[in-house]
Amino acid sequence: MAAAAGVAAGTGRGSGEGEELLPNAVEGDGGCGGGGTCAGDRPWRLNFDGLRRPEAHQEKPPRRFHDRLGGLVQSPGDDVAEYYQQQSELLEGFNEMDTLTDRGFLPGMSKEECEKVARSEALAIRLSNIANMVLFAAKVYASIRSGSLAIIASTLDSLLDLLSGFILWFTAFSKKTSNPYRYPIGKRRMQPLGILVFASVMATLGLQIILESTRSLFYDGDTFRLTKEQEKWVVDIMLSVTSVKLLLVVYCRSFTNEILAIYTIRTWSMTVLENVHSLVGQSASPEYLQKLTYLCWNHHKAVRHIDTVRAYTFGSHYFVEVDIVLPCDMPLQEAHDIGEAPQEKLESLPEIERAFVHLDYEFTHQPEHARSHDTL
């Protein structure tokens, strides 16, 4: 039960809590699991159904002011609450893997619901692009007439809105029209590349605005003077821009798009770093690797060991490599079927693009795929 020990030990932080979880989890003598299959019928499977948090730690307390400042003053109860919160999230992830094992798929929206959401999002994107083009033209006129750096900066902001829409459209179009012979694994890497290009353009324009603003502070000339009529036009245009933006916010607030959430919640610097990490092959979190290990171990009773579980970014999704150990006398046909099924399960997870399941009969050999070509 090498994999069982690895998964159960990962649920604790080196405290006694994790050691107490292991015996109950491995015995599998509990009731029926969440997928509708009784754990007693398959005692070789890991089973965490009987584990529940104490009532005193059901909810994590709200974050206090000192937590937002960086946790300079730490309360003794915060660590305990955070620990149980992580345990709860880990158990929820295991339950999700049990559902995938028992049903063969994860519950989600129907095809009709997905099409309805796609149509609504497409309409919102079209309206946003049309509004941005109108606003950009109006801001260009206001910038030429006024010469105000504030209005020019707002004009560049509208230009960036149009550019971001074009980049998103181009990346989506490229992913759908990729040639399977020239690009065997598709063009999913176009998304992080497009975001990096957009971030570079935005940083360049922002830096140029800062330089021009600094230069104008030391310029004593009085070049740009507006008449009353020109001021009225400029103010009306900027008020119209603000009104249209507010209407778009109200209309689009119901769409919980992850890309838009990243743009609004995280800073652009964090977004750039995130996409850089996705291109260089950063490993998945330990909690996610535990979920994958749990899924592979509970796949089939013939699995003797799980030698390796890797998940690393290759674009916006994960590539997964799993090495499982089967009996050395197992027929090839049976071993192939056992190895193919977890690959299909792994690739059905929304975060995973490709999964590779390797079969072996022992786990004492040297690590495979030695880096013999590395020169550093």
Curated annotation (Swiss-Prot):
Cytoplasmic topological segments: 1-123, 171-191, 253-376
Keywords from the UniProt entry: Ion transport, Membrane, Transmembrane, Transmembrane helix, Transport, Vacuole
The annotated region (Disordered) lies at 1-28
Q: Does the keyword Disulfide bond apply?
A: no
Q: Which residues cross the membrane?
A: 124-144, 150-170, 192-212, 232-252
Annotated localization: Vacuole membrane
> What InterPro entries has UniProt attached to this entry?
Cation_efflux, Cation_efflux_CTD, Cation_efflux_CTD_sf, Cation_efflux_TMD_sf, CDF_Transporter
Major subcellular location class: membrane
Name the SUPFAM superfamilies for this protein: Cation efflux protein cytoplasmic domain-like (SSF160240), Cation efflux protein transmembrane domain-like (SSF161111)
Write down the superkingdom of origin: Eukaryota
Q: Which segments sit on the Vacuolar face?
A: 145-149, 213-231
Regarding the membrane, this protein is recorded as:
Multi-pass membrane protein
Q: Give GO terms: molecular function aspect only.
A: manganese:proton antiporter activity
Note whether Transmembrane helix occurs among the keywords. yes
Cellular component GO terms, alphabetically?
A: membrane; vacuolar membrane
Q: Which Pfam families match?
A: Cation_efflux, ZT_dimer
Q: Function of this protein? A: Involved in sequestration of excess metal in the cytoplasm into vacuoles to maintain metal homeostasis.
Q: Which family does it belong to?
A: Belongs to the cation diffusion facilitator (CDF) transporter (TC 2.A.4) family. SLC30A subfamily.
Q: Please state what the protein is called.
A: Metal tolerance protein 6
